[in-house]
Amino acid sequence: MHDRDGEALGKKVAFAKTELMPWFDELSRRNPFPNASEQIDLVVGVWSPVWSTIPFQDIFPGRIHEQSYQIFQANGYYANMARYAPGKLPLLKQFIEKLVAYDFMILQKFEVRSEQWFIQNIGIQQGFRLNLSPLSSEKAQAWFESAVQKQLAKGEANTTPDFQKLDRSTAKKYEKIFQATAQLQHLYIDRDFRLVKTQRAAKQRPSYTIAVRKASTNLITGISN
């Protein structure tokens, strides 16, 4: 599955429809924690999204899949983040990727109401880094905790994200995403593995994410390539 996460979105969607849906249906039937209220304690921690059809993850080119994370806190804060290796010109790509990296985080809040998960996007964090060491799970968690503290200090009065540092095309895409509250459903969840279905509107195509707790990446090897 890790090898397939870098494929084009349309190809991943087709793969899900033709190959993965029987697996998803079977996992859903075997879900040991089908009630959303039982799932809250299970999600807390750092997860690696090893495969996903969520469109916004690859709005920027060059996402490093091994340095992509989902992090949940017990206080209701949640983040999707990743490191990106910019630079697409053949002569400069290798040089730039070795020196510079771009880290991007979407800060979110989650809650369970009437046995349903709801996700609200509340901010973004971003920055260029010297690409001398990877964005490890420990660094990702520290960055997330710092972002949460900044958000708590601001309070709930201002939850409008700052898109000024993004190019106009990307900013428009994220503005549209931020306007909606996503519904999230764990088709399957245990302490180390999550199969998640997300949808922002009833008429929208649902997205699927396979995530494993960062220390347990061997749990998806049974899914066919």
Whereabouts are the PLM-identified features?
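Soluble ligand-binding/transfer domains with enclosed cavities or grooves
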Residues: 1-225
